[in-house]
Amino acid sequence: MKYFAEYIVGRNGPIEVFMQPQNPQLVAEEVSRKLTSPGYLDGARRFAVVVWALPDGTTHMDDVPESSPARATYIQCGGSTKAMSVEIRATHEDGSYEHYAVAREPIADPDAWTTVTWDNGNPEPFSLRLHPEEVFTGEQAAPVFRAYIEAGALPPTELLRRLDV
């Protein structure tokens, strides 16, 4: 069985979360609740959810070294339940990686951009430049997270835009 850990990021920094007992369905349910609850992911107190899978055979996040590529392979969102980005990163043993912005549907106009902003505790809000199709609500993001957690599924390639980060 696959195990998962989360980081919840807010104004006061990241908080690690490791549910026990757990299975992929329970983790997906818990993450869905966080993504869809306006009182939880509000874009200020809490503005990001990161989920990563523990390596096969590992049953607790404390057993995964900080340097493990597993900790740098994840799905994340940033923003609020009303407007968020969804990103996926795949990190390899040699440290190389691919990082993608996820879209709800294929990009209609590659020259069209919008901004998702949240309060990360700095004097100025954090802004992320996205195509309009890359802006999700929590309800729209939940199935993407669920597929990633329950089946290890990535969205189709036409919905992934590689980022240079």
Each predicted region: which residue ranges?
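Short secondary-structure capping micro-motifs at structural edges
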Residues: 36, 58-65, 69-76
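Acidic, proline/glycine-rich low-complexity IDRs
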Residues: 1-56, 78-165
